[in-house]
Amino acid sequence: MSERVILAYSGGLDTSVAISWIGKETGSEVVAVAIDLGQGGEDMEVVRQRALDCGAVEAVVVDARDEFAEQYCLPAIKSNALYMDRYPLVSALSRPLIVKHLVDAAREHGGGVVAHGCTGKGNDQVRFEVGFASLAPDLKVLAPVRDYAWTREKAIAFAEENAIPINVTKRSPFSIDQNVWGRAVETGFLEHLWNAPTKDVYDYTEDPTLNWSSPDEVIIGFDKGVPVSIDGKPVTVLQAIEQLNARAGAQGVGRLDVVEDRLVGIKSREIYEAPGAMVLITAHTELEHVTLERELGRFKRTTDQKWGELVYDGLWFSPLKTALESFVANTQEHVTGEIRLVLHGGHIAVNGRRSQESLYDFNLATYDEGDTFDQSAAKGFVHVHGLSSSLSARRDLAGK
């Protein structure tokens, strides 16, 4: 029996060409694995059949939408994950899930090699291969696009020469990756930083001015950090993301034009659309402001940033990320309540908060009659709080 290669299959040009190329160049059989992450577009059965038509001996489609939402997007919500304070890890979150299912497929179908279609410039090669090394160090890795310097032109030529059944065009200007958490667009004229995105860049979001006269007010309920309701109606995490993608997307919310620091050392420009993700992270962050004690909240903001950096850098399976998630789980014990937001003109505005776990005390906060704050204690507090600063200032002045 020939050696089997388990290929992460997207249904696009590069991975369709890879099926035929691997067979011709290595003599191996290819098992194509396509993961449904809520990316929409083509029917997954069409994708599966294409893999078979391209020469795969088997083609597997995994419906991982709920798994992706519950086990990958939800931790990102709880960690308010925004790489460089902006990017909600649209692609980065999906890669470890794909790795997991490729490893499972390798065990089930007798594969000794796993393959991906990443280039040598991007972050995804790291995310895939560090993931494989973490979960299945015995598996060999094949990366034909990177290791054999494929270009789009070369891939198209190979497809035409070998009658690979896929429709391609040399004029498609963008590289696109999408799932239910969001959509990433790069390359083409966007590589020139001064060029503004054109309308055809966007798909998940409408023009922010389109529904200008119809703002959308939404109430999101959380239970211990988990989104559980929208406008009082129970939802799963996947349903919350999908519903907010539609509602926030209609208001032009979630458009991000970012120059980010890639793991490989270069800067790249990316256009992201993540309407549901940005609304959920905004709401969750606001509820934490209401329910977390000050020092806990301050420290968690540092761990949120680190968690996002670890995921971006392909270290999903690292001990540090695992440890941080244990900490985050503890912080979510009281993150229960509702946040009201207005979605309008591409913006998210919080205008209401309520929680039985709130640390906001009206009687302490009010400046009106009924104030219970003991202002007589403030003078001594200010003196003690500033004592170290006043002592050092006194010393410095005496030395002049």
Curated annotation (Swiss-Prot):
Binding annotation for L-aspartate: T119, N123, D124
Residues where ATP binds: A8, Y9, S10, G11, G12, L13, D14, T15, S16, G117
CDD domains tied to this protein: ASS
Residues bound to L-citrulline: Y87, N123, R127, S175, E260, Y272
Domain of life where this protein originates: Bacteria
GO biological process, one term: urea cycle
Record has Ligase as a keyword: yes
Keyword Amino-acid biosynthesis annotated: yes
PROSITE patterns referenced in this protein's UniProt entry, alphabetically: ARGININOSUCCIN_SYN_1 (PS00564), ARGININOSUCCIN_SYN_2 (PS00565)
Catalytic activity reported: L-citrulline + L-aspartate + ATP = 2-(N(omega)-L-arginino)succinate + AMP + diphosphate + H(+)
Subcellular localization: Cytoplasm
Enzyme Commission designation: 6.3.4.5
SUPFAM superfamilies, per database record: Adenine nucleotide alpha hydrolases-like, Argininosuccinate synthetase, C-terminal domain
EC top class named in words: ligase
Main location: cytoplasm
GO molecular function, a single term: ATP binding
InterPro entries linked to this entry: Arginosuc_syn_C, Arginosuc_syn_N, Arginosuc_synth, Arginosuc_synth_CS, Arginosuc_synth_type_1_subfam, AS_cat/multimer_dom_body, Rossmann-like_a/b/a_fold
GO cellular component, one term: cytoplasm
Pfam families hit by this protein: Arginosuc_syn_C, Arginosuc_synth
Pathway the protein takes part in: Amino-acid biosynthesis; L-arginine biosynthesis; L-arginine from L-ornithine and carbamoyl phosphate: step 2/3
Record keywords: Amino-acid biosynthesis, Arginine biosynthesis, ATP-binding, Cytoplasm, Ligase, Nucleotide-binding
Subunit structure: Homotetramer.
Recorded family membership: Belongs to the argininosuccinate synthase family. Type 1 subfamily.
UniProt-recorded name of the protein: Argininosuccinate synthase
The species this protein was found in: Mycolicibacterium vanbaalenii (strain DSM 7251 / JCM 13017 / BCRC 16820 / KCTC 9966 / NRRL B-24157 / PYR-1)
Gene that this sequence comes from: argG
